[in-house]
Amino acid sequence: MNHAFRTTFLMLGVAAVAAFAAASVYPWPEAVVISDAVNKPLFEGFDTRNVRSIRIETYNEDRNEVERLLVRRKGEEWVLPSHSSFVADSGRQLGAIVNLLLDKTVLEKRSDNQEDHLKYGVVDPAEFSSSVNRSSLGKKISLSDRNNKELASLIVGLPLKNDPKRLKHYVRIPGQPSVYVVDIDPRGITPNFTAWVSPNLLKLSQATRLQDVTVDSYRLDLEKIDTSSRDVSYRSQLVVGEKKIDVVLETASEDGKLNEVMPDAGQQGTIQQAAGSITSIPFSDVITKSKLAAKSLRKPNQESEKSAFESMKRRGFRVTKFDDETWQFDSMGGSVTVRTADGVTVTLYIGAIDNQTRNNSLKLNHYLMLVAGVDESLIPEPEKPEAANEDSGDTESQKVYLRKVAERVKQLKIGRQRAAALNESFSRWYYIISEDTVARLRPELKGTGL
């Protein structure tokens, strides 16, 4: 009897231990704190029209540091003060972030205990140096008005594990212990410069009609930038006609002269891909030019001294001449010229290698400079009719001619205005582009040398 009792007792003990172990690993629902905040807006009275600055703070695990970014409204534009007030012109990013905290309804209140901040990943990034577990640092966004008064601020933590869409996240208002659950997409909360700027450097739209894209592939010796001759590889031109696209290729002979050749299928494909890449030119940073160089590029005139561009040589650019009311250059890595049907031209000059390490990346980067102008030959003068008899007065053909002349003058004026607006945007900056981007813009063509 005693033996049977001991066996039964032992079996009950094993069952109890097994039940405890199962309970410890079973995904029981977490406790929800009852709160009046549930089903109410997280930020009462928040109005996006009052937002004048955006602050982002996130922890970068690879670099083991907190990265910060400030975006500020300046007149009609948003600018990045940390990047010499470069314009943050990614409308999609700005719209998403400014509206990110609007109408955020509290779905649950999960905790009032400060010790749970680690568990839910809502530790303020500002506590980086004292945080025990840095993976618990959340993403912080703060929106302020013109007087730097905070309108709304939120730390976004971990996503809920049982949410298939992974949109529900734990969040906390800085300075408060409560942890809530809201629907929010935190991907836009990033200090990454590239997320805030548009890669459409040429400001091309669906209404813009390309005329042609010309690639001049050559090299200059940076150490002899003043005297170095072009080491030419090829020149390609993609011409966009009304009914078809033509590809013209000239390759360099041993004496450096260009000779037209028939491009093979592979070369044609590469040239077409290069032309297509002009619509999106990603850049990772910007550097300001000297004030004198920027002024001379913003308002080009022949009276400017070439010495205004002296500082550009160490970046791989040398001025060559003033032509068609535009300063023209040679650049260490060749150039790409884009012409549009309205007469506007933009030349992308590819400069020297940027020796500064950026974002702990070992990849090579280059300087890029853009200059806009107008090519009047793209809007040809109308043919003048034969002189009419003195007695006949103004003939119909003469009236048509005068209308065409007036239309050309109008088109050129619009083109010059657009070129001036582009130079206003381009003149201050060297853009930092990757080696991969250079290879897309100015590709190597098999059988052409370089």
Segments (PLM) and residue ranges:
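Secondary-structure "cap/kink" motif recognition
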Residues: N2-L450
